């Protein structure tokens, strides 16, 4: 196993998405009207690291499932598994090890199993996403958005704070906005070649996604006005 290829397959540049886990610290400070405790900060940081490992295991799974289609993609064909830099057996072994490591960190973040339970739900959702749901238009975007909500929930459980329904709605609208813009970028990049890749992308068009993005922008603005 090439260490550099394996590291690239983990997609550490995508770990920035897991900062949603740390949002719970801001909610904790706002709820209590004071700085969050050291214990809450350490637990939330462990939850953040747990999500980094678990999300990397999910990326490995997705790349294993899509390896043949990725080889036809102008950009994804350079990924370690699709390019052959990382063998399929090595990727499978790495996926298991990284996933177990993520669950262990999740348990350490909240010994009662609260964070680990969220990680299991996140992994289960992405298992369904990799094999089926990503091929269903709009459902694929909602799956991505739900993944961000799981991050927020894990952070809340680690920090010992309950996230409000309004905060979840705000996060959902923001996550959907990001997911739809990602789909828009993919459609623009692939152009006519979209038919050779993911099935759901064939159902998206620039005009259709722009309409959805506009709706999400309206939802975000309404939420901001409501909370003024």
Question: What positions do the PLM features span?
Answer:
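Generic alpha-helical transmembrane segments of integral inner-membrane proteins
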Residues: 19-23, 45-56, 93-104, 108, ...
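Acidic (Asp/Glu-rich) catalytic motifs at the cytosolic membrane interface
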Residues: 54-80, 139, 180-188
């Amino acid at each position: 196993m090439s260490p550099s290829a394996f590291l690239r397959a983990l997609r550490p540049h995508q770990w920035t998405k897991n900062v949603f886990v740390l949002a719970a610290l801001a909610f904790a400070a706002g709820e209590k009207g004071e700085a969050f405790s050291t214990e809450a900060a350490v637990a939330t940081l462990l939850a953040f690291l747990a999500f980094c490992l678990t999300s990397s295991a999910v990326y490995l799974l997705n790349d294993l499932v899509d390896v043949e289609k990725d080889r036809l993609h102008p950009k994804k064909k350079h990924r370690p598994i699709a390019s052959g830099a990382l063998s399929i057996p090595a990727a499978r072994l790495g996926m298991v090890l990284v996933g177990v490591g993520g669950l262990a960190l999740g348990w350490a973040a909240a010994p009662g199993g609260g964070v680990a339970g969220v990680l299991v739900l996140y992994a289960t959702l992405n298992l369904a996403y990799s094999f089926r749901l990503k091929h269903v238009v709009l459902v694929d975007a909602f799956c991505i958005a739900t993944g961000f909500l799981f991050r927020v929930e894990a952070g809340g459980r680690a920090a010992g704070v309950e996230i409000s329904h309004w905060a979840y709605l705000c996060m959902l609208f923001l996550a959907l906005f990001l997911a739809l813009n990602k789909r828009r970028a993919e459609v623009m990049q692939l152009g006519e070649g979209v038919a050779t890749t993911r099935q759901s992308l064939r159902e998206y068009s620039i005009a259709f996604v722009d309409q959805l993005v506009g709706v999400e922008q309206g939802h975000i603005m309404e939420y901001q006005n409501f909370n003024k």
